[in-house]
């Protein structure tokens, strides 16, 4: 467990050292999971390089043990860094934290208790991260809970955006163009990945159980949807298994498009 905690803390500390550097001309923001929508995972900065890497020291640590019922054991998240603030999903409840990038001070924390629905999630724990959106005035943090809810937060306060969805939340198991086996509480669908924000559209995929271990072929179809970033209104849906009359339906022989599932887009969309 110590190794997992240190991994999160060291990554944050290294970001903190870069943000604290006297050179402020370089863009050290990391505003999306992959740095940018192209998925480059690259920033052209040289404040940390081969000549000084061995001189880095831990500036601060932040432990996530108390954000959930037990310590995290499978850390996969990538924090975002925007204007000197670090945003990350954290803990077994998949809360969201905002930290001062220089000092590590906790600025705010947000989490939702999802009860049985969260416990039954096929994609539990802290997940791979979250997304950031701004129009130059408003700044929002967007993430998907273990129970498959899309949440919009004020980046400055961590409070839910009341005008988004229903009190800042969209139930992704609803308006999904299918009936979920197991219903809202135990229906097998979730998401580890961060939602992708393209312009003013939030793109959300779907995932089933990890490790190619579906209980049945007749399972949830992992459709992809786009939502308006301001209101949460569903803008479009892509059926990964085509419906009757749609392109590709006839290639699913013997009516298999009606019964087959497990076709999620679980990875990070770019």
Predicted stretch roles:
Residues 31, 46, 97, 151, ...:
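Conserved hydrophobic/aromatic positions in well-ordered beta-strands
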Residues 21-25:
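Sec/Tat signal peptide C-region and signal peptidase I cleavage site
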Residues 1-6:
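N-terminal secretory signal peptides that target proteins for export/translocation
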Residues 50-53, 84, 101, 135, ...:
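Inter-blade boundary loops/turns of WD-repeat beta-propellers
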Residues 9-20:
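Bacterial N-terminal signal peptides
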Residues 153, 158, 219-233:
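Beta-propeller blade signature
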Residues 26-70, 105-119, 159-184, 233-240, ...:
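Aromatic (tryptophan-biased) beta-strands that constitute blades/sheets of beta-rich domains
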Residues 30-34, 72-91, 95, 121-149, ...:
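Repeat-blade elements of multi-bladed beta-propeller folds
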């Amino acid at each position: 467990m110590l190794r997992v905690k240190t991994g999160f803390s060291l990554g944050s500390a290294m970001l903190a050292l870069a943000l604290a550097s006297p050179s402020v001309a370089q863009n050290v923001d990391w505003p999306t999971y992959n740095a940018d929508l192209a998925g480059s995972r690259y920033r052209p900065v040289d404040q940390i390089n081969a000549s000084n890497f061995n001189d880095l020291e831990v500036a601060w640590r932040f432990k996530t043990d108390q954000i959930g019922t037990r310590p995290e054991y499978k850390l996969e998240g990538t924090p975002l860094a925007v204007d000197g603030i670090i945003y990350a999903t954290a803990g077994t409840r998949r809360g969201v934290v905002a930290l001062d990038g220089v000092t590590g001070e906790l600025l705010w924390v947000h989490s939702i208790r999802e009860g049985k629905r969260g416990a039954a999630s096929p994609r539990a724990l802290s997940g791979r991260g979250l997304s950031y959106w701004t129009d130059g005035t408003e700044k929002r943090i967007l993430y998907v809970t273990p129970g498959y809810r899309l949440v919009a937060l004020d980046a400055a306060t961590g409070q839910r955006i009341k005008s988004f969805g229903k009190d800042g939340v969209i139930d992704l198991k609803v308006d999904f163009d299918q009936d979920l086996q197991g219903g809202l509480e135990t229906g097998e669908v979730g998401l580890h990945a961060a939602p992708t924000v393209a312009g003013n559209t939030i793109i959300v995929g779907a995932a089933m159980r990890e490790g190619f271990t579906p209980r049945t072929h007749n399972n949830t179809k992992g459709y992809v949807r786009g939502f308006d970033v301001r209101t949460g209104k569903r803008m479009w849906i892509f059926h990964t298994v085509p419906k009757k009359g749609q392109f590709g339906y006839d290639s699913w022989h013997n009516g298999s498009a009606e019964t087959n599932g497990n076709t999620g887009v679980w990875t990070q969309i770019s």
